[in-house]
Amino acid sequence: DLVPGEKVHAYKNVSMNEQFFQGHFPGEPVMPGVLIVEALAQAGGLLLLNSEDKAEEKLVFFTGIDKVRFRDPVVPGDQLHLKIELLKYKMRMCKLKGVAYVKDKKVAEAQMMASVVDKDRGNNG
């Protein structure tokens, strides 16, 4: 579900085959929170690029995260439902709200800031 300039919904199936489960934690596998935030950020990048004209000429750089909260563990067999909302987009600076759910239960949330730049600027800067 993608509405350019507004929102995106994305999904991540969490499998026991994920490399990170080997050490996080042995016998008690839990998806690292930083990877849940990464999934939110990637979905946010998808939303931002699909909101741009000539997206193939753009890059998204995440510049910060705020108000990160982890509410429940994510374990093998879960499906993350990622909901991203574009809160603000002004002069190439963006603010997004991301919430991750498992079976309609909120497991994590974050506000993310990003900048959308031209590829040639991104490579020189």
Kindly label every feature range from the protein language model.
Residues D1, V8-N13, D66, Q111-V116, ...:
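Small/polar/charged residue-enriched interaction surfaces, especially the RNA/DNA-contacting tracks
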Residues D1-M31, I36:
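Catalytic strand-loop segment that frames the active site of acyl-thioester-processing enzymes
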Residues K12, K83-L86:
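Short, hydrophobic/aromatic-enriched beta-strand segments in well-ordered soluble domains
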Residues H24-A55:
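Helix-adjacent hinge/juxtasegments
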Residues G44-H81, V107-E109, A114-S115:
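Hydrophobic beta-strand-centered segment that forms part of the acyl-chain substrate-binding groove
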Residues V75-D78, E85-G125:
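HotDog/MaoC-like acyl-thioester-processing domains
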